[in-house]
C-alpha cells in the first residue's frame, strides 16, 4: 500500500482534532468539529482550510503567454498583470484534463494552480505539449503551502495580520510579497466556497504559525478550522464543479454548462476543434441541477431515469446545509434538461421522484 502524503500542516490537523481520511493520496481532515458547523461558520463568519495539497506549476519564459494560451480554454492574454482567471485544460476530444486557476504575473511568468489529484498528470501533460515554445515549466507544489480563509469575516480577520490594505485587492486579483504574520506571502481574493475570502500561499516552514495565528485572531469572530467535507458542500451549493464529478476526461466544459470559460473565438488551443464541433452540432448531454421531491439523499453514481429509461447519472448529491433540501447535480441526456422536467433518481432500491431545477442553488454577493 502506498504511503499517504502529508501537508506541512499535518501536525495542526491533529492538534485541532481533525478526522483524517485518504483524499487523492493525501492524509487530510474530512472534518474538525463537524461538517455542518464548519459549513455554517463559512457562510456566516469564516473558516480556514488547509489546501496545501493543491498543485502549483510555474510557466516562465518569453513564450509563456503563448504557451498557456495554447494549453487552456480561456483567454489569458486578456488578463492584466496580477489578475487571475478560471479555465480548463482539455484533451483534443474536448474532455477535461483539469480545471485550474491561472495567475498572471506578466507575459513571461504565469502561475497555475491545479487539483491535487491531477497535479502530476497536469505537469506531464504540459511537458508533452511544450513543443517548440520557449518556456520553462516548474512544478513547485512540494515547496508551497496554501491556506484558504473564507467567509464574510475573512477580510477583517486576515487584515489583523498584515499592513497591506486587503480591501484594495479585487475579486480574482492577487498581490505578491505581502507580509502576513511576519511571513512573505502571495495572497489572492479567490476561493471555492461561494463566499468572499482569500487564498494565501506561503513557504512550508511558515504555514504552521500562520494557521495558528489566523485561528487565534478569528475564533472570537466565529472562525473555525474546516475540512474537506465542508469544502465540498460549500462548493456544491455555490455551483462550483469538482473534477471527477461534474467535470472529467469524458465530460466537456460545454456539457458541464461552463462554456463561459471557453473562448472559442481565440486562436487555436488544445480541444478547440472538438468544442467548436460540439457547439455547432448541439449538446447531447448536460449537467443539470435537481431537487428531490421524495425523501432520499442522492449520491454520486446513482442512476437518473425517466420511466424505465436510464437518462444519466448523479454527479454530486447532498442534503444542503444552507437550503435544508436534498439536491444534486446530474449528467443527463440533453432532451430532459429543461427546468421543471420530472425525473426519477434510483436511491439504492427505491425509485424516488425529483425535478430538474436551476444549478444556482446559492449565490452570495462577492467583493468586486
UniProtKB/Swiss-Prot annotation:
UniProt subunit comment = The glycine cleavage system is composed of four proteins: P, T, L and H.
Q: What is the lineage of its organism?
A: Bacteria, Bacillati, Bacillota, Clostridia, Peptostreptococcales
Give the organism the record lists. Alkaliphilus oremlandii (strain OhILAs)
**What name is this protein filed under?**
Aminomethyltransferase
| Enzyme nomenclature, EC number | 2.1.2.10
NCBIfam families according to UniProt: gcvT, PRK00389.1
- Alphabetically ordered keywords of this record: Aminotransferase, Transferase
Q: Does the keyword Transferase apply?
A: yes
Q: Which reaction does it catalyse?
A: N(6)-[(R)-S(8)-aminomethyldihydrolipoyl]-L-lysyl-[protein] + (6S)-5,6,7,8-tetrahydrofolate = N(6)-[(R)-dihydrolipoyl]-L-lysyl-[protein] + (6R)-5,10-methylene-5,6,7,8-tetrahydrofolate + NH4(+)
Q: Which GO terms describe its cellular component?
A: cytosol; glycine cleavage complex
User: Which purpose does this protein serve, as stated in its record?
Assistant: The glycine cleavage system catalyzes the degradation of glycine.
GO biological process, alphabetically ordered: glycine decarboxylation via glycine cleavage system
Family matches, as SUPFAM superfamilies: Aminomethyltransferase beta-barrel domain, Folate-binding domain
Return the similarity comment.
Belongs to the GcvT family.
Q: Which PANTHER family match?
A: AMINOMETHYLTRANSFERASE, AMINOMETHYLTRANSFERASE, MITOCHONDRIAL
In its UniProt record, a GO molecular function of this protein is:
transaminase activity
